[in-house]
Every structure is written in structure tokens, then in C-alpha cells.
Amino acid sequence: MKVLLLGTGDAIGTPKIGCDCPQCRHAQETGTGRLRTSLLIEEGGRHILVDTSPDLRQQLLRAGSPHIDAVLWTHGHYDHFMGFGEFYRVQKCPPVYAAEPVLRYCGGTFRFLEFEHHPVEPYVPFDLFGIRITPFLVRHPPAYTCGFVFEAHGSRVGYTSDTNRDIPEKSLDLLKDLDLLLLDALVPSHTRIVKHMNYLDACTLAESLHPKEFRCIHVSHVMPWEYPHLAEDGNVFEYV
């Protein structure tokens, strides 16, 4: 199982349009910005795309234009699903897996694009291409939001998507002792946002869950680049 981070940024991305902060200047000068958060999971030549960001065309071209065998949506915020329109005239009827409220909301936006609807239930595992996938609930008010745990070859990877600190205990149980934990960490530790975790929240949670590896995703342009544990676009993790 190969996990490729297509994007690690927040809804705005880095650099932010019109911003001259140190992080955005660094991104412009070095070409190391952050596209909107999304990941690509490969197993046995099949590809699962987790969230379809507005940067999807650029992300898939960078990844070598893989055929997408399944799409997973976490929730109905535009930076996590609006790029789905990039499948138009590229790939017919892609299969999409998501919780019923998410399928209903996101699917209503893409009436011009036919796709397979596959509702999934939180905490009910399903299998795709040799990967066991378990959706779990997180708290990202007011959006109904799920994360996913991916398991193959005895390795487990957890992806929270967007969430605040109040993750249900049943979900936390699934996230213990992972090989890789990908956690929302939108802003530095001194900033508090109701529907997201900050850097300290993410690091504290990761410490309590004991993953072998931990990375912060969904990172905003105000996060200093030098902080430890920050994921970067193009990071790859392989489990065989």
C-alpha cells in the first residue's frame, strides 16, 4: 500500500493569493507551496483518491495521471470535493464512496457528471482492491464529516480530514497504534478555531495515540515552515 500526499494545505492553499507573509514569500521563492489537502492510495495497480480538491487536475498530472478506481469523500466543504468536476470528459462514471449525507450534498453539485453512488456507514468496514477501509466520525461543525482508516499488509494508516479536538471515543479507539497518522492542524498553537485543531492539539493527540509516524495536514499559510511533523506535498509512505 502506497500513500501519496497530493496536497497538504487548507482551503486557501499556500501561497495565499495576495499575501506577503513570511510563509507565502517562502513558498513563492522556493516553489514549495501547499495545494489543497488530498491523498492518493495505490495498491496492486489500483488507485483510491481521498477527497477531490480544487487543485485536482494539477495534483493528478503531478502524480503521473493515474486512472482513479475509486473516490472517497470526507465531507461537503468545497476544498474537499469541488475538484470532482475535473473528471468531466476524462473518466466516465467514477465510483464514489462516502457517508449518505455527504454523497447527497456533494452529488447534488455535479448533476452534469454521472458517477456511481456507494453509501458507507461510520465504523462499518468495507474492502476495495485488497485494502480494508473503516470510516469514522469526527467533529467539524456544522459539516457531517468522516475520516478513514486504511489497512493492508498488516499496516494501518489513519486520515482524520478536518476535525476539532472533540473526536468521539469510538473513533479514537480506531486511531490507536497506527503505522501512520495524518491529522488536521490548521494553525499554530497560539490560535484557536472552533472547527479545526491547532498544532498543539494535533501533537498532543498524536502523542496519546502512539502512531509509528505522524504528520500534520490541512496546514494554513500562517503555520511556520520549520515546525516538526508538518507534511509536505508529494510525501510518500509505503507499506508492503
What residue ranges belong to the model's regions?
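Metallo-beta-lactamase
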Residues: 93-146, 152-153, 231-233, 237
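Cap/insert and terminal regions of metallo-dependent hydrolase folds
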Residues: 165-240
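Conserved beta-strand hairpin/beta-sheet module of binuclear metal-dependent hydrolase folds
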Residues: 1-59, 144-161, 180
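Glycine/Thr-rich phosphate-binding loops of Rossmann-like dinucleotide-binding domains
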Residues: 13, 58, 81-82, 106, ...
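Active-site metal-binding loops of divalent metal-dependent hydrolases
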Residues: 8-9, 52-54, 76, 138-140, ...
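Short loop/helix-cap segments at secondary-structure boundaries that form the rim of catalytic
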Residues: 63, 87, 106-110, 126-128, ...
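Active-site metal-binding motif and surrounding structural segment of the metallo-beta-lactamase
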Residues: 45-98, 179-180
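Short, hydrophobic beta-strand segments that form beta-sheet elements in well-ordered domains
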Residues: 47-51, 71, 95-99, 117, ...
